[in-house]
């Protein structure tokens, strides 16, 4: 059933907005669709069976499709940071007013259920020109938009950033707006940027705006870091590996992880990757191989070790098959049998187990 003949929205003015419209114009696969409703009230939506899920402003789930429908709204700055907003969602808010509050022109295009575009801010022209441009001066009211700009630059590698948009970001940082960002919002955007096709562009945007030193002051950012995270993206590494490579040259990586409140898996890989890279350079002997396996807890966490090796392979040649065979060879050693052989002399167990593992590696 198309949205044009959906009884759930019959009589309502509904439009697809944001990323789904933008990506459709770019010929990219459509993700989740977001809808805006013009001329309705929360009571209207409730009568139709829509399920309210919004916190700060009215957002509803369609009773059948579970897609999100938000009432058209305007925003007014009422405090510092990304939470300092007052919203108005009256039935008199127009579609154009709703689009005007959005961040970038490419995200401020609407489409009717019949496929007609509504583009009061010339977003289609910017999509065609491959330009990321802020909608208006209200962009400066939300510092998260600096991070989002970096993420979009990482995702759309062939898009440039309008000079006036970069200038506005710099003014925002100079005004202290970036200092109001909370870790959860920074991590949300940074992690999504790392998972984009060109993560280095996110760092470039944040650095040029002056925001990188504010939101990630511990990070050591240079050409090597940027090249490595881009190679990680090309190789399809998961987030933990990309984050570990981001932090590889950062001495204060633990402090950075705590600041961002990064997931434990990401912080673990960031901590272990330098050890792995250093050890791999000198891992010709079974003793060096075993030290790396044990220090990385590869026997208990083989999947994490495998992911770690894949991240290390971005930096230096790694024979993944050989390392997997080594881990399996060490895991095959029966520690219980060795303990029984050393019954009565517990001090012999640890060296005997190590010797057995070294012998196994010698034949792996």
Swiss-Prot record:
InterPro entries: CCA_bact, NT_sf, PolA_pol_head_dom, PolyA_RNA-bd, tRNA_CCA-adding_enzyme. It catalyses: a tRNA precursor + 2 CTP + ATP = a tRNA with a 3' CCA end + 3 diphosphate; a tRNA with a 3' CCA end + 2 CTP + ATP = a tRNA with a 3' CCACCA end + 3 diphosphate. Its cofactor is Mg(2+). GO terms for molecular function: ATP binding; CCA tRNA nucleotidyltransferase activity; magnesium ion binding; tRNA binding. Its EC number is 2.7.7.72. CTP binds at residues 19, 22, 102, 148, 151. It comes from the Bacteria. Keywords: ATP-binding, Magnesium, Metal-binding, Nucleotide-binding, Nucleotidyltransferase, RNA repair, RNA-binding, Transferase, tRNA processing. One of its GO terms (biological process) is tRNA 3'-terminal CCA addition. ATP binds at residues 19, 22, 102, 148, 151. Mg(2+) binds at residues 32, 34. Catalyzes the addition and repair of the essential 3'-terminal CCA sequence in tRNAs without using a nucleic acid template. Adds these three nucleotides in the order of C, C, and A to the tRNA nucleotide-73, using CTP and ATP as substrates and producing inorganic pyrophosphate. tRNA 3'-terminal CCA addition is required both for tRNA processing and repair. Also involved in tRNA surveillance by mediating tandem CCA addition to generate a CCACCA at the 3' terminus of unstable tRNAs. While stable tRNAs receive only 3'-terminal CCA, unstable tRNAs are marked with CCACCA and rapidly degraded. A single active site specifically recognizes both ATP and CTP and is responsible for their addition. Belongs to the tRNA nucleotidyltransferase/poly(A) polymerase family. Bacterial CCA-adding enzyme type 2 subfamily. This is CCA-adding enzyme. The gene is cca.
């Amino acid at each position: 059933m198309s949205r044009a003949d959906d009884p759930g929205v019959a009589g309502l003015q509904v439009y697809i907005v944001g990323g789904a419209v933008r990506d459709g114009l770019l010929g990219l696969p459509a993700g989740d669709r977001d809808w805006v409703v013009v001329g309705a009230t929360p009571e209207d939506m409730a009568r139709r069976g829509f399920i309210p899920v919004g916190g700060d402003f009215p957002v509803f789930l369609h009773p059948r499709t579970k897609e999100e429908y938000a009432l058209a709204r305007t925003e007014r700055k009422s405090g510092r940071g990304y939470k300092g907003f007052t919203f108005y969602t009256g039935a008199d808010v127009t579609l154009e007013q709703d689009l005007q509050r959005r961040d970038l022109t490419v995200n401020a295009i609407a489409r009717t259920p019949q496929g007609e575009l509504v583009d009061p801010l010339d977003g289609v022209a910017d999509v065609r020109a491959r330009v990321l441009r802020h909608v208006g001066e209200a962009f400066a009211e939300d510092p998260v938009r600096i991070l989002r700009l970096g993420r979009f630059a990482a995702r759309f590698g062939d898009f440039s950033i309008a000079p006036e948009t970069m200038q506005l970001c710099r003014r925002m940082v100079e005004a202290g707006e970036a200092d109001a960002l909370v870790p959860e919002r920074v991590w949300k955007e940074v992690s999504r940027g790392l998972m984009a096709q060109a993560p280095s562009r996110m760092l470039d945007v944040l650095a040029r705006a002056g925001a990188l030193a504010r939101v990630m002051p511990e990070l050591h950012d240079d050409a090597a870091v940027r090249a490595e995270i881009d190679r990680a993206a090309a190789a399809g590494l998961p987030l933990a590996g990309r984050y570990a490579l981001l932090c590889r040259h950062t001495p204060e990586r633990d402090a950075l992880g705590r600041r961002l409140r990064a997931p434990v898996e990401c912080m673990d890989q960031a901590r272990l990757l330098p050890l792995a890279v250093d050890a791999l350079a000198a891992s010709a002997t079974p003793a060096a191989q075993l030290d790396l396996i044990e220090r990385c807890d590869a026997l208990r966490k083989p999947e994490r070790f495998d992911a770690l090796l894949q991240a290390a392979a971005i930096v230096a040649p790694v024979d993944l098959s050989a390392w997997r065979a080594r881990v399996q060879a060490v895991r095959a050693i029966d520690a219980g049998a060795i303990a029984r052989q050393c019954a009565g002399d517990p001090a012999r167990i640890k060296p005997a187990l190590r010797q057995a593992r070294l012998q196994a590696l010698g034949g792996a």
